């Protein structure tokens, strides 16, 4: 029953989205990164925005208490994300998008085969909402200002004898500002 999985806004100031499974907020849902625990603590409300959609190969959603095998955080369920693999057939993927509300996304994915044993995938993502508006003139922006840089490099070594070695690095930088307009910070309306 997928009706028990919903996406909602958890924070009006930052605009963070949160998954609700079985009616409970995202802090009771465990986010997995290729079956490894991912976002925890203060990053939990932003866990969905830290996973660029163009990087994904698949998503698996599990609901209920039977999912506590992978950790105690998964009271209501788990969301597992699988990323593009170093052995991906597409050598280069570029995606640019700009919405009419000034939100911009840039995604790059490149898979490289380096001989018979080594392969790598380089993933890049930049998203931002740099210019925001206050259409109803209530001294609060309609969306928060934000800028996010996300980079990952994953490697795979596969020997003819069957030995595999997988490793990688991932970096994330996210900056957000509140929804107050500059004039409301000083009491001007």
For every predicted segment, state its role.
Residues 36-63, 151:
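Short acidic/polar hinge/loop motifs at secondary-structure boundaries
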Residues 2-37, 57:
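Extracytoplasmic beta-strand/coil segments of soluble accessory domains associated
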Residues 1, 17-20, 46-52, 61, ...:
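N-terminal periplasmic accessory domains that precede
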Residues 6, 28, 38-39, 65-69, ...:
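Short beta-strands and strand-coil junctions in structured, solvent-facing domains, enriched
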């Amino acid at each position: 029953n997928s009706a028990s999985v919903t996406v909602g806004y958890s924070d009006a100031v930052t605009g963070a989205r949160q998954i609700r499974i079985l009616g409970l907020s995202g802090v009771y849902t465990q986010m997995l990164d290729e079956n490894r625990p991912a976002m925890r603590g203060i990053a939990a409300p932003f866990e969905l925005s830290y996973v660029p959609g163009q990087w994904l190969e698949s998503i698996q959603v599990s609901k209920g208490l039977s999912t506590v095998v992978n950790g105690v955080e998964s009271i209501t369920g788990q969301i597992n994300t699988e990323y593009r693999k170093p052995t991906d057939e597409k050598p280069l993927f570029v995606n640019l998008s700009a919405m009419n509300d000034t939100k911009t996304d840039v995604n790059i994915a490149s898979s490289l085969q380096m001989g018979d044993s080594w392969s790598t995938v380089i993933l890049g993502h930049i998203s931002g909402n740099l210019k925001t508006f206050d259409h109803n003139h209530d001294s609060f922006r309609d969306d928060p200002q934000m800028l996010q840089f996300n980079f990952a490099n994953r490697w795979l070594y596969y020997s003819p004898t069957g030995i595999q070695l997988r490793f990688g690095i991932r970096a994330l930088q996210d900056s957000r500002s509140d929804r107050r307009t500059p004039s409301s910070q000083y009491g001007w309306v």
